[in-house]
Amino acid sequence: WDHLGTDARLDGDPVYNGAIDNATGVAGIIEIAEAFAHQATPPQRSVVFAAVTLEESGLLGSQYLVEHSPWALERIAANINLDALPMHGPSRNVTALGYGQSTLDDDLTEAAKTQGRIVVADDEPEKGFFFRSDHANFARAGIPALYASSGQDLVEGGLAAGRKAADDYTANRYHKPSDNYDPDWDYRGVIADLELLYTVGRTLADESRFPQWKPGADFSRPAPGAK
């Protein structure tokens, strides 16, 4: 859960509703959990869905979960993160933050192919987005983590339209009371993203392998007994 609260210093609406950041991410977690629950055959692995708090205060909720994990860290196969799902329609690409660090990117690429999409790296790594959401605490603990969502190459309008939509959100709604629900949202891209991440998660949940960090990655899997 991600909420900035209220700001009495503001004129007019003082409430940061956080409709996109991050009510959409929480709704996405619930949707994927429901999809797992309704499958006729349960997954081979346990799948945990966690909505943590205080992301905007320094990723404190996910930090607490990792530091007080009910499970030994080396037994956690992977982390898949959802945060602020884009609402500007379907895209031809998927942006993976920290692309190339772990074999989860290979799983993502294979799943994206079934949707006719390609996976690309974040084109602004200097902004440190990989370390600004809750998956970062799992990565620091050595657990391969995936954070991916629709890229900016939109089916309708291409890169120009995607960048315009992203810039408009950042300038006018990101971390502002104006981040409200909009009845004109285009859910097609979000649905594609949730189906994609479900596929990656379900594939991992039905296998015994553990995703690994690639050579040269900034992290390594936790040693037995690590907390």
Language model: regions and residue ranges:
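Catalytic-core environment of secreted peptidases
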Residues: 1-50
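Short acidic (Asp/Glu) and glycine-rich catalytic loops that position anionic groups and cofactors
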Residues: 9, 84-90, 173-179
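Second-shell loop/turn segments in exported
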Residues: 10-22, 51, 91-99, 122-128, ...
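Soluble non-cytosolic domains of exported or imported proteins
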Residues: 19-27, 56-60, 98-102, 129-132, ...
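Sec-exported extracytoplasmic/periplasmic mature domains
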Residues: 31-41, 67-71, 109, 113-117, ...
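His/Asp/Glu-rich mid-to-C-terminal helical/loop segments that flank catalytic regions of hydrolases
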Residues: 34, 38, 155-222
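Beta-strand segments within the central parallel beta-sheet cores of soluble alpha/beta enzyme folds
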Residues: 44-53, 78-81, 214-216
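Metal-dependent peptidase/peptidase-like ectodomains
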Residues: 52-170
